Every structure is written in structure tokens, then in C-alpha cells.
């Protein structure tokens, strides 16, 4: 600021008391992403006659703007529609932690039918854990997997049905 160099934040918002420290933010509306994913889940569940949703929520890194918005979108919908968030833990936006967390959740809750992962890496790990536990994913499977970011491998897993809904960050 003192040097007169404009700062533009990309992909993550910053929480500062002086908004004049940066000129602009370029990135996704993470709350809207969470709301859109929840709207999709509601419509899908209604169309398929799924009356009870027991959701395992694998959060991103706690405090990250993507985690805050995507979590808020899910929690608002869960309250509005009476969905059960049976487990909630950070996967730190990584595949390894996503797998570890999903393994733990599956051991503690045998009624999970949706996993809401706040990015694709977490979803990849969660899917590995689900399959290792002898359960299936996809539209005809035991557990529906929702994800965000649609990286190349995420798109491929959405096309195969392993990820049932993948929300793009743009």
C-alpha cells in the first residue's frame, strides 16, 4: 500500500480490518456454491424418493473462505430441510486426510448415505475409504458423494458416477 502497488487477492478472501489493503478479490462465491450443491441434493433426493439424508460432512481447512461458505450452504439447507449431519470433520482439503476422516466416520455411523466433501481431493480419499469398507458410491450405490472444484480427475469421476454432483468454482 505504501509503495502504491495494488494488491488483488485470487481464489481466497482475506479477513482484514482495513479493506483498503487490497483492491479487489477474484474468485468464487463459496456460499453460493454450497447453496447450489444443497439445492441440487434436495432436488435429487426428492426425484429419487430419498426421504432421509444422513450426511457425513468432510470440511476443508477450518477458517478458509471456501470452507466457511461451503459449510454455511450445507448447514442452512440441513436446517431448512431436516437433513441429518451425522458427522463433521476437517479433511484439510487433502486426499489422505479425506480418506482418514471417512474411514473414521464409516466406523462410527452405519447410516451415512451422503458425503459432502468440500473439494475433489477430499472426495477422492472418501471414495477410496468407502470402497475399502465394502460400500458403493454413485446413483445406484450406498453413498452419494458431492464435491467441489471439478479438477480433471473430479470431472472424470463425475462422468463415471462416483461423484454424483461436482460444483465448479468460477
Where do the protein language model's features map onto the residues?
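A residue-level marker of the well-folded mature domains of exported/periplasmic proteins
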Residues: 1-170
Amino acid at each position: 500500500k505504501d509503495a502504491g502497488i495494488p494488491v488483488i487477492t485470487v481464489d481466497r478472501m482475506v479477513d482484514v480490518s482495513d479493506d483498503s489493503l487490497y483492491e479487489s478479490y477474484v474468485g468464487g462465491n463459496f456460499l453460493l456454491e454450497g447453496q447450489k450443491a444443497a439445492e441440487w441434493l434436495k432436488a435429487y433426493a426428492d426425484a429419487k424418493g430419498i426421504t432421509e439424508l444422513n450426511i457425513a460432512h468432510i470440511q476443508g481447512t477450518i477458517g478458509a473462505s471456501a470452507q466457511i461458505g461451503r459449510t454455511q450452504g450445507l448447514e442452512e439447507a440441513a436446517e431448512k430441510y431436516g437433513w441429518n449431519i451425522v458427522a463433521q470433520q476437517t479433511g484439510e482439503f487433502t486426499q489422505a486426510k479425506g480418506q482418514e476422516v471417512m474411514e473414521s466416520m464409516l466406523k462410527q455411523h452405519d447410516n451415512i448415505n451422503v458425503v459432502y466433501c468440500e473439494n475433489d481431493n477430499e472426495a477422492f480419499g472418501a471414495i477410496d475409504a468407502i470402497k475399502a469398507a465394502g460400500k458403493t458410491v454413485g446413483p445406484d450405490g450406498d453413498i452419494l458423494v458431492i464435491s467441489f472444484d471439478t479438477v480433471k480427475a473430479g470431472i472424470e469421476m463425475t462422468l463415471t458416477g462416483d461423484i454424483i454432483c461436482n460444483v465448479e468454482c468460477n
